[in-house]
Amino acid sequence: MSVNGTDPTEMTSDDGVETIADELLDQALAERRALVQLCLYALDRASAGVVARIEEGLSSIGVVALRADGERFDPSQHEAAGTVPTDDKSLLGLVAETEVPGFCDRGRVLRAPIVTVYTAR
């Protein structure tokens, strides 16, 4: 209840303008996106222990790290940063290492992992 006795979540105008609750939700979502981006920025510059803690915290709100080690390289899902030559034909085209983890927010990719890929020597 607000001061004037109305429930702000039920307020709507005759012309279909967003309710106060819709505006607050939009603001909260925008602030969440900004905080997640700030966490990713900090994560890229942090020590291993801090990285683990930030990833744990992000995971608790649905933002998960993407590491592609051992997966088949897919340019639509991975960003190639380099290659690793190999004579092992079974490794060709696989991700050798994730250099920078990617992140996904409840199924929506925020950034692709940056990887190195095995190629023929």
Where are the model-predicted features located?
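Intrinsically disordered, low-complexity segments enriched in polar/charged residues with Gly/Pro
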Residues: 59, 87-91
